[in-house]
Amino acid sequence: MKRERNNSLDPLEISEWRWSEFLDDAIKALELFDIEPYPIPEEFLTKEETIKFKNNQIKVKALTWACRTTKIRQARAACIEAGPAASVLNLVINPFHNFELPFFGADFVTLPSGHLLALDLQPVLKKDEIHNQKVWSKLIPIHDHWQSLLPSGGPIPQEAETFFSPGFLWTRLPLDDQGSKLISKVIRPAFQEYLTLYIDLISDAQEVSKERSLEILSGQKAYINYRAEKDPARGMLARFFGKDWTEQYIHKVLFDL
């Protein structure tokens, strides 16, 4: 019997979803803190449709898991399963602006053309040494190890560079056994190591001054506004669930600051 989801912490039921173990890793890590549900409107907790794909009817499903803590404003996972059309985990952890913390970002996308996989602790104030020094000194060695085992994902848009750190792990992998092996043997342990570092940063974070928190908030808003405007999943989501639902999901859930 299918269970209804009443809040954003309720379990997700997605049959044969490629990224389930990654989400389990994230939830387990976040449960080290006292988490509570993040308020997600009911229409975005679970969404199902049937669409036409290559002359076949397929079911597509979108589910949202989200929480908050005393230091995390919103940690949310957007989970999409569309069989041969797409399989997606987009995880963003957004800290409160009164802590000197980056964003955590993981974007794992499987499409008919291959896997697009990105992972980073994204700076709020990229040109600010105080904001980045402690993070990058620990992140870059982790990145360099795992990125050396993966092909490069290619260049990123110049306008987006300000929102990525030198520890941005980015790769494209084929839809074959080798790609699946790299996801299991490289991407997942890299994800776990990035996540462990981020959880440690949260644990150690102390409140900053009001003046500093306003600088951080300004940087967070710049990132959130950019992501909402340029979200590369917009077209896919609109094809699956319609333009109106997609725009509301992007602005009310995914990037709601």
From Swiss-Prot:
Transmembrane segments: none annotated. It catalyses: (3Z)-phycoerythrobilin + oxidized 2[4Fe-4S]-[ferredoxin] = 15,16-dihydrobiliverdin + reduced 2[4Fe-4S]-[ferredoxin] + 2 H(+). Keywords: Oxidoreductase. It comes from the Bacteria. GO terms for molecular function: cobalt ion binding; phycoerythrobilin:ferredoxin oxidoreductase activity. The keyword Oxidoreductase applies. It is an enzyme of class 1 (oxidoreductase). One of its GO terms (biological process) is phytochromobilin biosynthetic process. Its EC number is 1.3.7.3. HAMAP family: PebB. Catalyzes the two-electron reduction of the C2 and C3(1) diene system of 15,16-dihydrobiliverdin. Belongs to the HY2 family. This is Phycoerythrobilin:ferredoxin oxidoreductase.
